[in-house]
Amino acid sequence: MLTSSRNRFYWVNFGIPLACAALVFLLFDMTRIDIAFSNLLFDPVARIFPLDKVHFFEKLTHKWARIIPNWTAEIALIGAMLSFVWPLINTSKHPRLGGFLERSKAASVLRFANEHRRDFLFVVFAFAICTGVIHFLKAHTSVYCPIETTLYGGKLPHVEWYNNFQLFREAGDGRCWPGGHASGGFTMLALYFVARRYRWRYSKALMYGALLLGFVYGTTRVLQGWHYMSHTFWAGIFVWLACLLTALPFYGRARLEMPVLQKAEAPTAEPLTDLQSSKPDAPPSWS
């Protein structure tokens, strides 16, 4: 029973994104669908992508949109740092300090941060690892953005990532594959794994919301000529895998595969006793 459950977890969480990767590679990288779609958005007379010249569109979809993942990362980082403060405060030795913290409601914030230290640290690590993976791939494939290439009025050649990939060194100056802005939206998938730890009933809605956010982020850049559509799909695949591989050592497979809570059940942050015997998948002991 445990073996079949484990196999299903890995098949679903690794198998589906890997199947999507194969599909994207065959449908987009092996064809000219990306170029055909971008051609529809390009004005061949003016030699521009019209939406690239709309200042408000750029500000709304590229600059302001970053607030969501940026603030999430900043809140997680602040929470992770605060989580180490409460254990250092000895209210029995310093009752006046303890009283002040209680009156100012700071104590409840510090206790909350301490109780959710693992979650805050996970989000920080997941965001950092996702960013690192995307930056590595950008540097080691050196793909230029459509708007920079000769296909759309630029001066640089159009190249496919698999023709340019270098494992141990940077491949050039191109930094377009996979989609960086899309990956910013997809990194919100980290919150889905936090929700899975607590078996939140709406965790799937959170997952779909993060996927939609990343897709919207990526699509807006496609409309401006700064990415091909496949760049968004690749970003989602890599970010999912990075978040999943980060969540496994933080929370453990046994916890992540548990069914969501029903209305009458109370959430708990710890795995059930009968699942704790699965040592390879047991989460770390810190809170």
Whereabouts are the PLM-identified features?
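N-terminal transmembrane-helix/juxtamembrane module of multi-pass inner/ER membrane proteins
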Residues: 2-103, 141, 168
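Membrane-embedded catalytic cores of phosphoryl/pyrophosphoryl-handling enzymes
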Residues: 4-12, 159-274, 286
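Hydrophobic faces of alpha-helical transmembrane segments in multi-pass integral membrane proteins
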Residues: 16-19, 125, 129, 133, ...
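Alpha-helical membrane-inserting segments
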Residues: 23, 27, 77-81, 85, ...
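Juxtamembrane loop-transmembrane helix junctions in multi-pass integral membrane proteins
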Residues: 50-64, 115, 172, 198-205
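Interfacial segments of alpha-helical transmembrane regions
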Residues: 92-140, 203, 207
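Short, Lys/Arg-enriched, Gly/Pro-containing loop segments at transmembrane-helix junctions
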Residues: 93-99, 147-149, 252-264
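Membrane-interface interhelical connector segments
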Residues: 142-170
